[in-house]
Amino acid sequence: MTVSFLEQGQGTPLVLLHGIGSAARSFDRVIAAFAPRFRVVAWDAPGYGDSTDLPMEHPTAGDYADALAVFLDEMGVQSCHLLGHSLGCLMAARFAATRPERVLSLTLCSIAAGQANLPAEERQKLLDQRIGDLAALGPQGMAEKRAPRLLGPAASPEALDRLKDTMGSVRPHGYGQAAHMLSTTDIKADVRKLPPSLPGQVIYGDADVITPPERNRDVAAVWPGVAAHVIPGAGHALYLEQPGTFNALLAAFLSKSTS
């Protein structure tokens, strides 16, 4: 399997997992901020960027976690600080739940909790709507429609342009595979399996209409000892929208986790 990625810096690895309508390059400001202290690695998930698709038609969160394990092995990363955003949270939580010895800390941002607990009819409707938008509009058209909803009311035009750029680059098959995974996963089941000793934090925006604050709080509620932080005014794409505040929260958390 081929995986495209961005890498910068030396030291303890910090691994970044993007969301369903995104790409490794969306983390460029996070990478730049942390490269002086960490070896920062952001992958393009399977089916994104130049990464090959997963071989199964409807991969599970476990399949993405397995792919991440292989990728990290190839990178020589035995353990890391792990961060997931949105759909990336599902991959990160599954990886941490099944390979806790490889995770030094876990940060979940703008949590996509998964839809496994919804009625089957509702799950299928949401899946059809998501895949249907991409089929009807194409990646660029979908980005024009969806990207504005990922930002808070005070977001800059630059943040919107960056969102449209990454969302407009998705590949339909990889996006469809990720959408199926979202439809069949329950992140709480994985979070409940995390070892109590694992440092964890949740970061979310109070203006997020994609994964609303209560959804993030619900996940935090089943994660004993987790630190939960809200960024006022931030929408779903909080690390693009308010990079200074986001990076400060992450830096403070990592400082405590490595002390």
Residue locations for each model-derived region?
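Flexible "cap/lid" loop of the alpha/beta hydrolase fold
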Residues: 93, 97-98, 103-136
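Active-site loop/oxyanion-hole signature of alpha/beta-hydrolase fold enzymes
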Residues: 6, 29-35, 41-84, 97-98, ...
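Conserved alpha/beta-hydrolase catalytic His-Asp/Glu region
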Residues: 117-123, 136-193
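Short beta-strand/loop motif that positions the catalytic acidic residue
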Residues: 194, 202-204, 208
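Gly/Ala-rich beta-loop-alpha elbow adjacent to hydrolase catalytic centers
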Residues: 84, 88, 92
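Catalytic histidine-centered segment of alpha/beta-hydrolase-like enzymes
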Residues: 234-243, 247
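Active-site glycine-rich loops that stabilize anionic/oxyanionic intermediates
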Residues: 19-22, 86
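Alpha/beta-hydrolase fold catalytic core
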Residues: 1-15, 35-39, 77-78, 108, ...
